[in-house]
A protein has these predicted regions:
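A metal-dependent hydrolase metal-coordination microenvironment
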Residues: 4-129, 133
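Domain-core and long-helix interface of multi-subunit machines
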Residues: 1-30, 57, 112-213
Length: 213
């Protein structure tokens, strides 16, 4: 029997923090109400986002509460060592394939990465216990170290790197050579971008030697 339904259009939100977020927590509700709101908005796929680490209990609770209504992708947001023209630390996101790797495997890999402690000389690694001991706002990560560890432990189909060109922590460059070179580097590393309609012209531009994407 032929299927004449045609295309399905589903709503995705790949950058959504839960009440378990490690920083900037403005929620006044629990996971149950958070998940109900997601379902009420008819969102079919979410990128469950947290800074540096997603703990197993957060992911498992959200998945259990959403059930089969919503597909949940772990999205870890990293504040990098690099800064943009406004002096803000640049953020990048890594989305992990939950069908291929577990939250434990993700966290075991990240825990091997030494972070930059911007507050003191104390060694800190990318694990919840280590970061929480000094504060999530006190650490940044080397992009090169992150990428090297991901490539060492995972297959290309296990994760996607998402760049953030605009907004707080975005890498949209000014005219300074270092800013342009940094934007080119993040262009090349990123599999996709969290962007706006207005970003199209920027990413199609070949100004300042940037390769057309």
């Amino acid at each position: 029997m032929s299927n004449n339904i045609g295309s399905f259009w589903n709503k995705w939100d790949l950058h959504i923090h839960s009440p378990y977020t490690n920083m900037n927590n403005r929620y006044n509700c629990g996971i149950d109400l958070f998940c109900q709101t997601v379902k009420d908005k008819d969102i079919k796929v979410i990128g469950l986002t947290n800074y540096f680490i997603i703990q197993e209990n957060e992911y498992n609770e959200v998945v259990a509460e959403l059930g089969n209504d919503v597909y949940v992708i772990p999205n870890i947001e990293f504040r990098t060592n690099d800064t943009n023209g406004s002096g803000e630390y640049i953020n990048i996101h890594v989305l992990f394939n939950p069908d291929n790797i577990s939250i434990k495997a993700i966290n075991d890999t990240l825990a091997r990465i030494r972070l930059n402690n911007i507050a003191s000389a104390t060694a800190v690694y990318c694990s919840y216990e280590s970061i929480n001991s000094i504060g999530f706002d006190k650490v940044t990560i080397s992009v090169d170290s992150l990428i090297a560890q991901l490539k060492s432990d995972f297959n290309p189909s296990d994760y996607l790197i998402i760049g953030v060109p605009n907004g707080y922590g975005g890498f949209h460059p000014n005219s300074k050579p270092r800013s342009v070179e940094l934007a080119k580097k993040l262009d090349e590393l990123s599999h996709a971008m969290f962007g706006r309609k207005e970003d199209t012209e920027f990413f199609l531009s070949t100004d300042n030697g940037r390769a057309q994407l």
